[in-house]
Amino acid sequence: MAHSVTPLQWVAVKLIRLYQLIISPLLGQRCRFTPTCSQFAIEAIRLHGFIKGVWLASKRLLKCHPLSEGGYDPVPQPKRRN
């Protein structure tokens, strides 16, 4: 089932895509995680909505630093509501 995308989600995803296409290639591959932090942010915003998605992406960005081991770190699935 497809869910609707709010204007705020749409703008956030487009800004991240702009970063991926223009800025990221200039900086080179630096992310220690799979999926990359920018892809994680897009998936989190699409899956959880703008507020929780940005929160999850912010937490992920704080973990991505030179002392981090990195590795596979997917977006958590939403909890089911009964």
From Swiss-Prot:
Membrane topology category: Peripheral membrane protein
Keywords attached to this entry: Cell inner membrane, Cell membrane, Membrane
CC per GO annotation: plasma membrane
Localisation per UniProt entry: Cell inner membrane
Stored InterPro entries: Membr_insert_effic_factor_YidD
This protein's record includes keyword Phosphoprotein: no
One Pfam family this sequence matches: YidD
UniProt family annotation: Belongs to the UPF0161 family.
HAMAP family: UPF0161_YidD
Function of the protein: Could be involved in insertion of integral membrane proteins into the membrane.
Protein name per the record: Putative membrane protein insertion efficiency factor
